Amino acid sequence: MSTVIEADEIRRLAIAHLFGRKAQSVTSVDLRDRSTLCDWFVLANCQSDTQLQSILAGVRRDLRKAGVPTLRSECAAGSNWGVLDFGVVIVHVFLKDAREHYSLERLWKDAPQEEARPEDFPLPKTEAQADEADDEGFESEENWT
């Protein structure tokens, strides 16, 4: 059985994993009624080229594990901007100066934009964590009488 993941769920997963990898100033831009390119842009900042490469590789791997393939990725070594294309969602990770320079938010100023907060986008639980959470509050069998 194949599961289709909706665009908003891919956006939410991408944002959660960006925060999980210490990205900053994460914003989503709703392009559903404005572009045929994709439904969402997700924009984020990072502190260094090393962090940029790490975030891109990690988010790509994390979403692949969730069943979301990357259609294309771009980021040359020493670059100040990287892109992950998940089809309906495109993730842009910038060094701060590059984000200000390219200003995609200004380019899409008429599109709804949302500044994401980490507490609104928790990382999904792994199966092991979910099993552990299911067991919380239960006495062990040793204590049954």
Where does each model-flagged region fall?
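Long, contiguous binding/interaction regions
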Residues: 1-33, 50-57, 66, 75, ...
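Short aromatic/hydrophobic contact patches that present stacked aromatics
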Residues: 41-43, 83
